[in-house]
């Protein structure tokens, strides 16, 4: 009977034979076999002397296999292993117990060097294993693993080198040198024979594994098989299976110690089963008293207590001592207390770059992702997969976030994304949709959401970091999520009506040729019958050749092919459609380009080049995207670059996001409602600083993997931090970076990162920088909630500002404080009726910090300075205006930055708001970077020569140019931020003038004239100049310079802005708002 006819029976029989033979060989007693063997030529080194060691990529950590698999890559190809017996330690005894000789063997493999200690009995056991393997390999057992081994050793010499047979007790001290040489030769010959070198018994004898020789994991550390106890994790809510010791189990694991972490692997599968980071709480204790285990070792850090068990007390002492010695030698920086209580050290001479607004930031993130070779880490409060990172869109979907991630995943890059799992009743960011969308792109993309609110009992706090990390070598840190509404540039446009719009100065419908009239009628009929949202066509016209013009400058139009432009960059997926652009009011703003093109295609011969821009299109601060135009019998159609597609066009105070699973469908009418511009700050760091950012991400990822059962599968791997020793090897560098001293800061706690003690290093750094500033501080922040009363508000930032100003006053010193915050909080609500309860609650605490109450900054200053406080501090917001469909409109610019600059030499950039949620550490998780300049440039401070830092000064100047409107006017002197001329005649004067003009033209809210709700109703009913007399209003608006406006201190000052009793906001704990 053939195998073909009876496959099941014969397969079962063969498997039984294989199992029996395996058992026979496993139990084979090789002690009677001769140790002396025939000498053969063992030199199997590569014949080509040019062969160099092969670099094992870092990505190999994701492809580990079971230790007994025959085809695993452990060694550097073409690189020999050299063995040298350095010394022999003899342990004598007065009893009848034989003396023990312990051999110290030094091994070298490429750049790696390590030592192992072995007794002669270990050599004997190792030799017997190899003899057993030699006999076993001759038997044709039909298993995949065995067949592979037989095929690969068929042509290799199988004769083994000899091992000395004489007993150790017979060796005299003067014979040690000879014995050392014999053992050294034995190992050298074994290691030259691939058949034995690749066998798992050899790798275990040498204390090596698949992770031993990966360059980016740093020096070869301590390794070996050991027993570990389950449990010990510091996970909120876990008892017997967490920290408690009521129930546990022992498992055999392969322990690996590296310079900044240790891990253990499962020998059968090769899977990394846990990673323990070295930190300031890292301690090792040995003994039953400390471990409650005979021959136990206890290893503590901020996240876990790990219990190991050895074969003897001497073995446990050796393990404990070896680990401690290695960590002290290679990981000492991680054991120290660092400045501000941070988990990260100060990294000197690191490369750093700043970003003002998201345009440059998104572009550099996209370019860095494109350069990724191994890993991309992303964590955001909110992530929108369909956003475009480079705009205007001129290359189809190439620079759309989900397309970039899919492309890199297909190239083998591992992508790990952590999202904040929101309380769905409170927030509509739909992280579940984001996760589902990204996970189905490619298996190399893994997404986690945290926290689980029920199991963790975390309902009030959020993961608020915004990080992108490339190959653990470049990291982007700041306040910008990869999400809708964030992209903006220095123009802060209010309008984005899209591809084509009708200018009514063209011919009337009555003057159309009959063919064109028929075409327009057919368009009208087709639009009634075909729903436009189902048309798979990109509806933005992407102008490749044009560039953005300055605000208020005339724009020239040139001829272009509408049909060609509409179809040049089609999207690859049916879902990937942009929101529909309007052609004219005649089509009610809802006609699709698809219908327009098919209706007009027969009549393209009617098109002709246009002349200069029509009157009304060159008004200051109007949308100034790149424009093309064409003439038709219908009127003149002007094509404009669209920057914000679908949900990206937003005004969240007017209306919050809805239907995020329809990314390219508009949710507000862009023809009647201006968008809300977004002002933000971010940074990029390299090398060791980027390693520190990655370390935080890895800590959070591994903690979430342990905490949530759905992530415990092998498809969600543990992440490993790269070594600081290789951090200088930058494969990619962000253009425009400068050298500076960089330190990472964070807010983290048990719920967010699984650590024993909370960290509030961002708060400590803010207070320290403010207290030690000498000339000025410049703050941009989304919130301004401080001035501790130790009852409701606890962070000390506002108090530090007030005390620093008072100190300057007492010392008769010039000192300036610039604060730029949003004019309104970013919550949905109609400010004309007082705003929503959430909006009012934030307004209450902002005003409480700035100017209302004795604990406020101005309250503290007025008590000693009277009205002189105005010479020290300025509070401002940002506002802009434009023309939308023939009407003048205005909107505040939403300041989302989290920035502090001091003295043109120190900068803090991050995700942390100035409020208790971000600063106290126990609440929201945050990330920030403090940059202190080492490179200086000549400057001026208080009228005197001053050496300013390149990083800080450059960032401060760019912020000033943007908000003051000096980007295109270098003649204005903004070098000296302390002088009276700049502070009073430029900064304060510009803010006051702009605010006055906006109030005059638009009667803006918030407004100092409105002290209560009765005045608010009267205020909004009064006529608005922008509507009553647009021409005069335009003349007034020409006097506007930049975006800076004074912050209105007295808006609704006679009202209680805290949530009223009975509202759902009043039920929420006060900590949510602070």
From Swiss-Prot:
Keywords: Cytoplasm, Disease variant, Endoplasmic reticulum, Endosome, Golgi apparatus, Hydrolase, Lipid degradation, Lipid metabolism, Lipoprotein, Membrane, Palmitate, Phosphoprotein, Repeat
Residues carrying Phosphoserine: 499, 561, 629
UniProt topology in membrane: Lipid-anchor
One Pfam family here: PH
Localization: Cytoplasm, Perinuclear region; Endoplasmic reticulum membrane; Golgi apparatus membrane; Late endosome membrane
Activity regulation, short description: Stimulated by phosphatidylinositol 4,5-bisphosphate and phosphatidylinositol 3,4,5-trisphosphate, activated by the phosphokinase C-alpha, by the ADP-ribosylation factor-1 (ARF-1), and to a lesser extent by GTP-binding proteins: RHO A, RAC-1 and CDC42. Inhibited by oleate.
Main location: cytoplasm
Tissue: Expressed abundantly in the pancreas and heart and at high levels in brain, placenta, spleen, uterus and small intestine.
Segments crossing the lipid bilayer: none
Lipidation (S-palmitoyl cysteine): 240-241
All copies of domain PX, residue ranges: 81-212
GO CC terms, sorted: apical plasma membrane; cholinergic synapse; cytoplasmic vesicle; endocytic vesicle; endoplasmic reticulum membrane; endosome; Golgi apparatus; Golgi membrane
UniProt-listed Enzyme Commission number(s): 3.1.4.4
Domain spans labelled PH: 219-328
Gene Ontology terms: biological process: cellular response to nutrient; chemotaxis; phosphatidic acid biosynthetic process; phospholipid catabolic process; positive regulation of translation; Ras protein signal transduction; regulation of microvillus assembly; regulation of synaptic vesicle cycle
Matches recorded under InterPro entries: PH-like_dom_sf (IPR011993), PH_domain (IPR001849), PLD-like_dom (IPR025202), PLipase_D/transphosphatidylase (IPR001736), PLipase_D_euk (IPR016555), PLipase_D_fam (IPR015679), PX_dom (IPR001683), PX_dom_sf (IPR036871)
Reaction(s) the record says it catalyses: a 1,2-diacyl-sn-glycero-3-phosphocholine + H2O = a 1,2-diacyl-sn-glycero-3-phosphate + choline + H(+); ethanol + a 1,2-diacyl-sn-glycero-3-phosphocholine = 1,2-diacyl-sn-glycero-3-phosphoethanol + choline; 1,2-dihexadecanoyl-sn-glycero-3-phosphocholine + H2O = 1,2-dihexadecanoyl-sn-glycero-3-phosphate + choline + H(+)
Residues annotated as domain PLD phosphodiesterase: 459-486, 891-918
Region (Catalytic): 463-928
Annotated function: Function as phospholipase selective for phosphatidylcholine. Implicated as a critical step in numerous cellular pathways, including signal transduction, membrane trafficking, and the regulation of mitosis. May be involved in the regulation of perinuclear intravesicular membrane traffic.
Subunit structure, interactors included: Interacts with PIP5K1B.
Family as reported in the entry's similarity comment: Belongs to the phospholipase D family.
Entry-linked PANTHER family: PHOSPHOLIPASE D, PHOSPHOLIPASE D1
Name used for this protein in its record: Phospholipase D1
Protein species of origin: Homo sapiens
Gene: PLD1
């Amino acid at each position: 009977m053939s195998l073909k006819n009876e496959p099941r029976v014969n397969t079962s029989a063969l498997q039984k034979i294989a199992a029996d033979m395996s058992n026979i060989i496993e139990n084979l007693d090789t002690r009677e076999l001769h140790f002396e063997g025939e000498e053969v030529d063992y030199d199997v080194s590569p014949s080509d002397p040019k062969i160099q060691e092969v670099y094992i990529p870092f990505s190999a950590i994701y492809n580990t296999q079971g230790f007994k698999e025959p085809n695993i890559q452990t060694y550097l190809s073409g690189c020999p292993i050299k063995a040298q017996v350095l010394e022999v330690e003899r342990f004598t005894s007065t009893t009848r117990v034989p003396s023990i000789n312990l051999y110290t063997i030094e091994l070298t493999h490429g750049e790696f060097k390590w030592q192992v200690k072995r007794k002669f009995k270990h050599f004997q056991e190792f030799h017997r294993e190899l003899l057993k393997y030699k006999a076993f390999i001759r038997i044709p057992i039909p298993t995949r693993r065995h067949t592979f081994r037989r095929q690969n050793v068929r042509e290799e010499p199988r004769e083994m080198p000899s091992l000395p047979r004489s007993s150790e007790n017979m060796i005299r001290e003067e014979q040690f040198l000879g014995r050392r040489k014999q053992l050294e030769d034995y190992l050298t010959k074994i290691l030259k024979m691939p058949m034995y070198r690749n066998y798992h018994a050899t790798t275990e004898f040498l204390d090596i594994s698949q992770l031993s020789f990966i360059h980016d994991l740093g020096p070869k550390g301590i390794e070996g098989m050991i027993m570990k106890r389950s449990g010990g994790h510091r996970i909120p809510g876990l008892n017997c299976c967490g920290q408690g010791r009521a129930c546990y189990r022992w498992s055999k694991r392969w322990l690996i110690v590296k310079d900044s972490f240790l891990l253990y692997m499962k020998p059968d599968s090769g899977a990394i089963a846990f990673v323990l980071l070295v930190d300031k709480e890292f301690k090792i204790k040995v003994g039953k008293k400390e471990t409650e285990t005979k021959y136990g070792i206890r290893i503590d850090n901020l996240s876990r207590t790990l219990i190991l068990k050895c074969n003897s007390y001497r073995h446990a002492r050796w393990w404990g001592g070896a680990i401690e010695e290695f960590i002290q030698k290679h990981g000492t920086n991680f054991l120290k207390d660092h400045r501000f209580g941070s988990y990260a050290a100060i990294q000197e001479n690191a490369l750093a770059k700043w970003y003002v607004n998201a345009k440059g930031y998104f572009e550099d993130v996209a370019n860095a992702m494109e350069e990724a070779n191994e890993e991309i880490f992303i964590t955001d409060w909110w992530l929108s997969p369909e956003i475009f990172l480079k705009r205007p869109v001129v290359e189809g979907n190439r620079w759309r976030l989900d397309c970039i991630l899919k492309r890199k995943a297909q190239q083998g890059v591992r992508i790990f994304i952590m999202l904040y799992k929101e309380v769905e009743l409170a927030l509509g960011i739909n992280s579940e949709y984001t996760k589902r969308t990204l996970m189905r792109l490619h298996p190399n993309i893994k997404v986690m959401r945290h926290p689980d609110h029920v199991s963790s009992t975390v309902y009030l706090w959020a993961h608020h970091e915004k990080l992108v990390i490339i190959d653990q070598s470049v990291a982007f840190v700041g306040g910008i999520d990869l999400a809708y509404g964030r992209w903006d540039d220095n123009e802060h446009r209010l309008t984005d009506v899209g591809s084509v719009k009708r200018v009514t100065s063209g011919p009337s419908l009555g003057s159309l040729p009959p063919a064109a009239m028929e075409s327009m009628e057919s368009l009208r009929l087709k639009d009634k019958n075909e729903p436009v949202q189902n048309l798979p066509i990109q509806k933005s016209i992407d102008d490749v050749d044009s560039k953005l013009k300055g605000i208020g400058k005339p724009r020239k139009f040139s001829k272009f092919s509408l049909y060609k432009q509409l179809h040049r960059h089609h999207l690859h997926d049916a879902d990937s459609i942009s929101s529909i652009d309007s052609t004219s009011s005649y089509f009610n703003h809802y006609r699709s380009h698809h219908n327009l093109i098919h209706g007009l295609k027969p009549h393209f011969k009617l098109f002709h080049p246009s002349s200069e821009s029509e009157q009304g299109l060159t008004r200051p601060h109007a949308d100034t995207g790149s424009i093309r135009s064409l003439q038709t019998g219908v009127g003149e159609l002007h094509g404009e670059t669209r920057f914000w597609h679908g949900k990206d066009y937003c005004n969240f105070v007017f209306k919050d996001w809805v239907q995020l699973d329809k990314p390219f469908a508009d949710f507000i009418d862009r023809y009647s409602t201006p968008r809300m511009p977004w002002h933000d700050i971010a940074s990029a760091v390299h090398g060791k600083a980027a390693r520190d950012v990655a370390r935080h991400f890895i800590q959070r990822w591994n903690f979430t993997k342990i905490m949530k059962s759905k992530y415990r599968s092998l498809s969600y791997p543990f992440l490993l931090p790269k070594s600081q020793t290789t951090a200088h090897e930058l494969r990619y560098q962000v253009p425009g970076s400068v050298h500076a001293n960089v330190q990472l800061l964070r807010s983290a706690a048990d719920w967010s990162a699984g650590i024993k003690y909370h960290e509030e290093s961002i708060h400590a750094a803010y207070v320290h920088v403010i207290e030690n500033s000498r000339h000025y501080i410049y703050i941009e922040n989304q919130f301004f909630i401080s001035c501790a009363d130790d009852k409701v508000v606890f962070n000390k930032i506002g108090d530090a500002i007030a005390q620093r100003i008072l100190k300057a006053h007492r010392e008769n010193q010039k000192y300036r404080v610039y604060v730029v915050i949003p004019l309104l909080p970013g919550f949905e609500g109609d400010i004309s009726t007082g705003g929503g309860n959430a909006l009012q609650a934030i307004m209450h605490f902002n005003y409480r910090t700035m100017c209302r109450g004795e604990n406020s900054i101005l309250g503290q200053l007025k008590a000693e300075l009277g009205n002189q406080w105005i010479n020290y501090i300025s509070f401002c917001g940002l506002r802009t205006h434009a023309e939308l469909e023939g009407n003048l409109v205005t909107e505040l610019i939403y300041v989302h930055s989290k920035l502090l600059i001091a003295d043109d030499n120190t900068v803090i950039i991050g995700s942390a708001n100035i409020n208790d949620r971000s600063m106290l550490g126990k609440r929201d998780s945050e990330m920030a970077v403090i940059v202190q300049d080492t490179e200086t440039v000549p400057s001026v401070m208080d009228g005197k020569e001053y050496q300013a830092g390149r990083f800080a000064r450059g960032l401060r100047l760019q912020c000033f140019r943007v908000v003051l409107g000096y980007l295109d006017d270098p003649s204005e002197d903004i070098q000296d931020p302390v002088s009276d001329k700049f502070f009073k005649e430029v900064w304060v004067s510009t803010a006051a003038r702009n605010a006055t003009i906006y109030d005059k033209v638009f009667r803006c809210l918030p407004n100092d004239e409105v002290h209560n709700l009765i005045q608010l109703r009267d205020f909004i009913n009064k006529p608005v100049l922008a509507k009553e007399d647009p021409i005069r209003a335009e003349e007034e608006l020409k006097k506007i310079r930049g975006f800076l406006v004074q912050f209105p201190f007295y808006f609704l000052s006679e009202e209680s802005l805290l949530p009223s009793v009975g509202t759902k906001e009043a039920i929420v704990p006060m900590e949510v708002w602070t």
